[in-house]
Design a protein with these regions (language model features):
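Secretory targeting and sorting signals
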Residues: 1-29
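Residue-level detector of alpha-helical secondary structure
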Residues: 14, 235-236, 271
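Conserved active-site-adjacent core of cysteine acyl-enzyme catalytic domains
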Residues: 33-173, 254-397
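Active-site nucleophile-adjacent alpha helix/oxyanion-hole segment immediately C-terminal to the catalytic cysteine
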Residues: 46, 50, 210-259
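Long amphipathic alpha-helical scaffold segments
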Residues: 143-213
């Protein structure tokens, strides 16, 4: 009798585990957009790729040394237990490469270091008071992690981050020239002969009405509540390398340095550049973290269209995962989050949508929560609001 009871308990446990992760009978992980096919039906001639990584000039080297030296002195004034304001003041420092500003621990921005130090601390403090728990790492988490490093290790990390940023300067200028109309600095092409000069007669680029990248069958749900970063990276790498099975989320969590606090967007971008070929010139070039705080909806949507159809590559989206922005969450909310942006549809009179691989399935962690499918075609304007609602207001492109 005891043996039969133990078998029954085991069977119930197995059934319960299955129910937690199984979809409802009506959920379908299949494309709702007929244009989302694989092999892709996209016209390849509309995808010219990005720009080559530029060389690090002597002026860039001097700027890197200036910012690193400032950090070397500041590192002795803070510890992991220092206040958020003190950590931000010591660690969020900015370099200027060819008139473009890059800030350590954040990304490419038009805001000053002082603005970022104030805005990020205030916005994340409000999010914390509201009881939000992130699946991504907050700026404060990143600052504390950096402060735990030995001083020499901090200097090496800062220098490596700035060198990677400096080599992406040409891409930033190319992107901002297309999106914002930012002019190239005087003498830029003379200093960077490796970068192709755009045609003087080139008109503003028009993008296809719809465009998708990546095999829609290559999806997975995240296995832990704070693994949206590793799962997003898993799917992006699977999209690049192909194969029947992707590397495990545990592998990606280790490679990205994910903790129970989550993964930073800087770690995500470095992962795409290191472990896939989407950073090649014929695709997206070196991925960057871009500040979208000053973007309105039209410019944000153009950024997405440009990336998918020109680069044929995914985007690391960075929204706050709230039901008010994502109706497919059916009232269930998360917080800071990563997804795979993989296309758009702006055809006809219907509102534009963004194609997503959504890693988060609430049913995986709570049997009473709704099932959320991996394939989503989400209203673009709501995605824009979710990105702007995130305390960091940035994206990986």
């Amino acid at each position: 009798m005891k043996k039969r009871i133990s078998v029954s308990v085991a069977a119930v446990a197995t059934l319960s585990a299955t129910v937690l992760s199984a979809p409802s009978s009506t959920a379908q992980d299949t494309p709702k957009d007929p244009a989302d096919t694989w092999p892709s039906s996209n016209v390849r001639t509309t995808a010219p790729g990005s720009v080559a990584a530029n060389k690090i000039t002597p002026a860039m080297k001097r700027e890197i040394s200036r910012v690193v030296d400032t950090g070397r002195r500041a590192a002795t004034r803070v510890t992991p237990s220092s206040s958020a304001r003190a950590l931000a003041g010591a660690q969020i420092r900015c370099a200027t490469f060819e008139s473009q500003r890059y800030c350590l621990r954040y990304g490419w921005t038009k805001r000053t270091a002082a603005d970022l130090q104030r805005d990020l601390v205030q916005r994340e403090a409000r999010a914390k008071v509201a009881g939000h728990k992130s699946g991504d790492a907050s700026i404060l988490d990143s600052l504390r992690t950096h402060a735990r490093m030995a001083p020499r290790a901090q200097v090496r990390a800062d220098r490596a981050e700035l060198r990677q940023a400096a080599r992406a300067t040409a891409k930033v200028l190319d992107l901002r020239h297309d999106i914002d109309g930012t002019p190239y600095p005087k003498g830029f092409f003379a200093r960077h002969s490796e970068v192709e000069r755009p045609a003087a007669s080139a008109s503003k680029r028009r993008y296809p009405k719809r465009y998708y990248v990546m095999n829609w069958r290559h999806t997975r749900q995240q296995n832990r509540s704070y693994w949206c970063g590793p799962t997003t990276m898993q799917l992006i790498a699977w999209g690049w390398h192909g194969g029947k099975k992707p590397k495990t989320q545990k592998t990606w969590a280790r490679r990205l340095g994910t903790t129970t606090s989550g993964t930073s967007i800087g770690q995500m971008v470095r992962g795409v550049n290191k472990y896939t070929g989407y950073d090649k010139k014929r695709f997206a070039g070196r991925y960057i973290v871009l500040d979208i705080s000053g973007y309105k909806y039209g410019k944000w949507l153009r950024l997405h269209k440009r990336h998918y159809s020109k680069y044929r590559a995914p985007i690391v989206t960075h929204p706050v995962l709230k039901a008010r922005y994502f109706d497919y969450m059916q009232g269930w909310s998360g917080s800071g989050h990563f997804q795979v942006g993989r296309g758009y549809n702006n055809r006809g009179k219907n509102p534009a949508t963004i194609g997503l691989f959504e890693p988060y399935n609430p049913r995986r962690f709570n049997s009473s929560a709704p099932y959320v499918a991996r394939l989503q075609y989400h209203r673009a304007y709501q995605g824009f609001l979710a990105n702007k609602a995130h305390p960091q207001q940035n994206i990986g492109v």
